[in-house]
Amino acid sequence: MNIDDKLEGLFLKCGGIDEMQSSRAMVVMGGVSGQSAVSGELQESVLQDRSLPHQEILAADEVLQESEMRQQDMISHDELMVHEETVKNDEEQMDTHERLPQGLQYALNVPISVKQEITFTDVSEQLMRDKKQVREPVDLQKKKKRKQRSPAKILTINEDGSLGLKTPKSHVCEHCNAAFRTNYHLQRHVFIHTGEKPFQCSQCDMRFIQKYLLQRHEKIHTGEKPFRCDECGMRFIQKYHMERHKRTHSGEKPYQCEYCLQYFSRTDRVLKHKRMCHENHDKKLNRCAIKGGLLTSEEDSGFSTSPKDNSLPKKKRQKTEKKSSGMDKESVLDKSDLKKDKNDYLPLYSSSTKVKDEYMVAEYAVEMPHSSVGGSHLEDASGEIHPPKLVLKKINSKRSLKQPLEQSQTISPLSSYEDSKVSKYAFELVDKQALLDSEGSADIDQVDNLQEGPSKPVHSSTNYDDAMQFLKKKRYLQAASNNSREYALNVGTIASQPSVTQAAVASVIDESTTASILDSQALNVEIKSNHDKNVIPDEVLQTLLDHYSHKPNGQHEISFSVADTEVTSSISINSSDVPEVTQSENVGSSSQASSSDKANMLQEYSKFLQQALDRTSQNDAYLNSPSLNFVTDNQTLPNPPAFSSIDKQVYAAMPINSFRSGMNSPLRTTPDKSHFGLIVGDSQHPFPFSGDETNHASATSTADFLDQVTSQKKAEAQPVHQAYQMSSFEQPFRAPYHGSRAGIATQFSTANGQVNLRGPGTSAEFSEFPLVNVNDNRAGMTSSPDATTGQTFG
């Protein structure tokens, strides 16, 4: 067999079954014969590479030719048309070969021959495929004809036994495009979309779309149950109900759950089982997956607690491994482990919002490590962590406060925290006898540190209301127990008013500041802290504030005296003359010898104020509550009181802004004087009360007022008061106050028991008070016991 025959057999294999019947295929073979030498050599080399003998290939070619010749009559016209198109494509390829140079033809012929040989993996398999392809065409044509056939009518058997033709589904619904065979079925279907129910029950007015539904419903009213169970005799309206019931007797369970492969006898039970078991289980799995995703995301973000995990013992690490089930044990911590590891230090977080979200203020506080470990720990961490951060630790309520306050000096870097963040937590300033005794002269530095960072609470309570109730009761319990410190600042409002607390503490501790002027909020804090310790009655102080809180701005001194011959005491308690006893006692330098004298002096001063208020309240026009009760039986204080600071800060510095000019009061004087400064001269010169204005409509003369006060005093019991002279106060403590309050003290001049008052302001400064007239060029106003020479203050 020559090369042309071989090429002819190969192209027949590639072309298909019907290639032998095409005349164009023979033409192609003839056209290619000019190149037979080159292509034949290439194909022979490929065949030799595949180790296939020439005899087997030739035998296969002969078998294919014979089988194709036997089937030439069965080839359809369509297949011949497809074959012609393939031949045209082959011709185009050959034309490209002829046009290309000789060098490119070799390159193009090599892959063509390879592709041809790849299709023939095995000769025996190829023969079997060819035999199947010979049988397939006729069968495929028959199947295609059956699918494509759509007969116009279908032969049916009617109810009477006659034959009939049935038309296909030509009626289509406009709403859902459903097709029906008859218009009746279509109209019945349309009722579903329109909601129309033409069939109505005559007994219960229920309506139905179809007539058979109505008939089945009417059986309920008639009680007819045509379907009966053979085993138990139960009857049913529907046949489906009877068949479902029979499965209970037979034990048949045809419905299976697709999740757990359990079998059930009814479909509703399968649905109920899926809802109860598998759907809830899937939800739980989804939740677990979400939690697991969150945990892994925390691991990826680097939010680990490795210092905590490395300190865990072996048993606790095993417990965390069991609970995490394969997760990283450095990222998952159990809550029980956190409760047990109270002695371990929590990790240092860079943001304070973590502290806000994670920890309760009532259970956590600032605490430094113990001296044995904390020193090296802080030194090592100081070079790595910038800036220094809080070390938080959970406080056990049963533990006592073991650490002294000298560690608070090491917490000075806490000033880097913002006030707005620190003010979210309410802390209490430490006031304990043992802690204060251990400090000594370092009291001032400690309070400075306490201003920067909140200290540890004395008691650890889980309820904030209980803590506040304890603070309210504590003021009565600590009245006579604290001898070392004058001011117990139980400030519960440090969170809302941090600046007020700092100002109050600074005014108590600072030695250089002799007369610090505080705002009204700071004064409120001072009043609470002072009268709790000094056992001065709350009613007295409250009445003093209420009585003189409606004075105009700028009052620095109010000079008044009681026209009483029995009151022989020359009490001159001015804000500039009060010794600085409390400040010296705050730093531990007070003397216990003069404490009893000062206590008696302040007790006498309290009684003096009460008597003055009793007299003025009877004649004052704007005291609307005549039933004011004042406690006069003050107990002797075991510790030196601090009324001097009250006189200094409250009565000399509180601004009063509500003056009512329409009311008459014998105690109102020039509006530029302060609240209380009892400037009383020598004992033999009693001074009268003088009014600050002359009301021409209803004015009370000074003589009438003095006569009234004198008559009332003679009728009353005459108490004996101890005389205190100016020389009784220590001179070293007077000097700072005279120096600092020089601007206020220059307004007064005392000569022979008479007080001269000069107001720096004019009537223009108080234009809202028409009855007040103060001129700069008028002479000094003199207050004397003589009613004829006494002038009213205006």
Curated annotation (Swiss-Prot):
PTM notes: Sumoylated with SUMO2. Desumoylated by SENP3, resulting in the stimulation of transcription of its target genes.
Pfam families, A to Z: zf-C2H2
Bias kind Basic and acidic residues: ranges: 321-336
Keywords carried by this UniProt record: Acetylation, DNA-binding, Isopeptide bond, Metal-binding, Nucleus, Phosphoprotein, Repeat, Repressor, Transcription, Transcription regulation, Ubl conjugation, Zinc, Zinc-finger
Subcellular location: Nucleus
Disordered, as annotated region: 298-336, 574-599
Compositionally biased spans, kind Polar residues: 574-588
N6-acetyllysine modification, residue list: 607
Regions annotated as coiled coil: none
ZnF C2H2-type span: 171-193, 199-221, 227-249, 255-278
Example GO molecular function: zinc ion binding
Main localization (coarse): nucleus
Modified residues annotated as Phosphoserine in this record: 51, 250, 301, 306, 412, 665, 784
Reported function: Involved in transcriptional regulation. Represses the transcription of a number of genes including gastrin, stromelysin and enolase. Binds to the G-rich box in the enhancer region of these genes.
Family: Belongs to the krueppel C2H2-type zinc-finger protein family.
Subunit field text: Interacts with HNRNPDL. Interacts with the 5FMC complex; the interaction requires association with CHTOP. Interacts with CAVIN1.
Full protein name: Zinc finger protein 148
Source organism phylogeny: Eukaryota, Metazoa, Chordata, Craniata, Vertebrata
Gene: Znf148
